[in-house]
UniProtKB/Swiss-Prot annotation:
Processing and modification events after translation: N-glycosylated.
Record's GO cellular component terms: chloroplast stroma
Location of region: Disordered: 21-153
Protein name, UniProt field: Alpha carbonic anhydrase 8
Record: active site: 204 (proton acceptor)
Signal sequence annotation: 1-22
Biased composition (Pro residues): 25-129
Record keyword Plastid present: yes
Domain of life: Eukaryota
Amino acid sequence: MKISSLGWVLVLIFISITIVSSAPAPKPPKPKPAPAPTPPKPKPTPAPTPPKPKPKPAPTPPKPKPAPAPTPPKPKPAPAPTPPKPKPKPAPTPPNPKPTPAPTPPKPKPAPAPAPTPAPKPKPAPKPAPGGEVEDETEFSYETKGNKGPAKWGTLDAEWKMCGIGKMQSPIDLRDKNVVVSNKFGLLRSQYLPSNTTIKNRGHDIMLKFKGGNKGIGVTIRGTRYQLQQLHWHSPSEHTINGKRFALEEHLVHESKDKRYAVVAFLYNLGASDPFLFSLEKQLKKITDTHASEEHVGIIDPKKLSFESKHYYRYSGSLTAPPCSENVIWSVSKEIRTVSSKQVKLLRVAVHDASDSNARPLQAVNKRKVYLYKPKVKLMKKYCNISSY
């Protein structure tokens, strides 16, 4: 069998490898001649085995290291927002204290100036109308829910406190079951003289004023003489009888020398016109819607008022308008008169205030005695005399 040259080469390689592997171990230096067999390219065999796997660890360590690089920028944004916040806080604080002292000093200075404003309040008190009531009634009102209504009268002026705290106020409900019947007062009679008069719109009612007071004796009660000062009207009536209210109430206000008052009141139902009011219609129309205006009426004889009354109620009370003074003797006729609806309307239209009434609400009777005068048959006369009780 023939062996090719390649085969011989392989045989030589194998023999050389066998010789190298079979060489004794304790003689390491002798392998130096081994380089001679290396030319047959035994080295390529270690090439596949060379530890080139070592580069594998290289890719793992370097690439995780760049991760720490992004960490430094994180602290930068955090400090940035924190510094601007404290800066605006001090800015607003300094300007606030500065303006506050400026307005405070001027405000206490004007405070004493408005102090004199309460001074005008006493105006109604120093200038009462004849008969003790307020001359200008626009200082109060009859609106029950208003700030100047009857429930507030006592707080509107120091001189009007009795309107709120008085225990003998007027008007009241006159109940027959609670009265004391008496025939000791005497019949109702007046002694008036003709007098010059004017008619005036006071703001809530129409007043007929007797200039200088009527010079007649007027009426006498408990030995005291009272002269007629003025008369005025309320609609509906202020007093009631046994709970019934009437269309109109007329007040004849008398005054004594010591500033006490006697008021004689007449109540009206709707019906035939009243002759005395009829005689004043021309003047009433002239003062319509003209507050504080005063029209000359001329000479009037109060006897035309038809003063007679056989039965009347008597009690101690007050003025029914501010200042509500409790120094009034009331005589309220039990005999009802008549007035036309046109006349009642004329009295209200002439005033033309915000209310549809100028009647004060009823007041408590409290412990007062109310008398009903009923004369003996032999004493009944045409005129009545008001005497003491």
